UniProtKB/Swiss-Prot annotation:
Family membership noted in the UniProt record: Belongs to the IL-4/IL-13 family.
An individual GO BP term: B cell activation
Entry superkingdom: Eukaryota
Stored SMART domains: IL4_13
GO molecular function, one term: cytokine activity
Source organism per UniProt: Tursiops truncatus (Atlantic bottle-nosed dolphin)
Record protein name field: Interleukin-4
Disulphide-bridged cysteine pairs: 27-133, 48-85, 70-105
The organism's taxonomic lineage, starting at the top: Eukaryota, Metazoa, Chordata, Craniata, Vertebrata
Glycosylation positions in this chain: 62, 96, 102
Signal sequence annotation: 1-24
Protein purpose: Participates in at least several B-cell activation processes as well as of other cell types. It is a costimulator of DNA-synthesis. It induces the expression of class II MHC molecules on resting B-cells. It enhances both secretion and cell surface expression of IgE and IgG1. It also regulates the expression of the low affinity Fc receptor for IgE (CD23) on both lymphocytes and monocytes. Positively regulates IL31RA expression in macrophages. Stimulates autophagy in dendritic cells by interfering with mTORC1 signaling and through the induction of RUFY4.
Length: 133
């Protein structure tokens, strides 16, 4: 009985520490995958990179990080569904951003940018987030 009472706090601590490690590691892996995909895409020279997309990064006032990720994912989904450009990597980016945002949203931006500029900006945001992870 005495051994059990000594083990309980140790097991609770072990579970808490393991949980923090696993969640931190998931953040790192997801961000690494996003950054790697963005590096590959932004290096490509393709007409698709000149497509106009909604500039969801222009309005950062009163926008949470999760909302930004959600809106960026929505833009990517629109591109790979309607323009058939970079379907596999863009759908992977959309999936990862959606898992980070964990919400649904719509995009109605008047301001536009090119897909290339959009991806470059997203890459910069993800690298900044990774440096804090």
């Amino acid at each position: 009985m005495g051994l059990t009472s000594q083990l309980i706090p140790m097991l609770v601590c072990l579970l808490a520490c393991t949980s923090n490690f696993v969640h931190g590691h998931k953040c790192d892996v997801t961000l690494q995958e996003i950054i790697k995909t963005l590096n590959i895409l932004t290096a490509k020279k393709n007409l698709c990179m000149e497509l106009p997309v909604e500039d969801v990064f222009a309005t950062t006032k009163n926008t949470t990080e999760k909302e930004t990720f959600c809106r960026a994912g929505t833009v990517l989904r629109h591109i790979y569904r309607h323009h058939k450009c970079f379907n596999q990597p863009l759908s992977g980016l959309h999936r990862n951003l959606s898992s980070m945002a964990n919400m649904t949203c719509s995009v109605n931006e008047a301001k536009k940018s090119t897909l290339k500029d959009f991806l470059e900006r997203l890459k910069m945001i993800m690298k900044e987030k990774y440096s804090k992870c």
